[in-house]
Amino acid sequence: VIPFVASVAAEMQHVYCAASRKC
């Protein structure tokens, strides 16, 4: 099983972190 959901969730979190600059 490919952890597609986990991969997408991690990418979305990274984008949100970069956009909000709350890293």
UniProtKB/Swiss-Prot annotation:
Give yes or no: UniProt keyword Flavoprotein. no
Intracellular or extracellular location(s): Secreted
Which Cys pairs does UniProt list as disulfide-bonded?
17-23
Q: Which Pfam family, just one, is annotated for this protein?
A: Antimicrobial_1
Arranged from A to Z, the UniProt key words for this protein are:
Amphibian defense peptide, Antibiotic, Antimicrobial, Cytolysis, Disulfide bond, Hemolysis, Secreted
UniProt xrefs under InterPro entries: Antimicrobial_frog_1
Kindly state one GO CC term assigned in the UniProt record. extracellular region
Coiled-coil regions, chain positions: none
According to UniProt, the tissues expressing it are described as:
Expressed by the skin glands.
Q: Does the keyword Secreted apply?
A: yes
The UniProt function text for this chain reads:
Shows antibacterial activity against representative Gram-negative and Gram-positive bacterial species, and a very high hemolytic activity.
Its name, as the record gives it, is Brevinin-1Eb
Q: Which organism is it from?
A: Pelophylax lessonae (Pool frog)
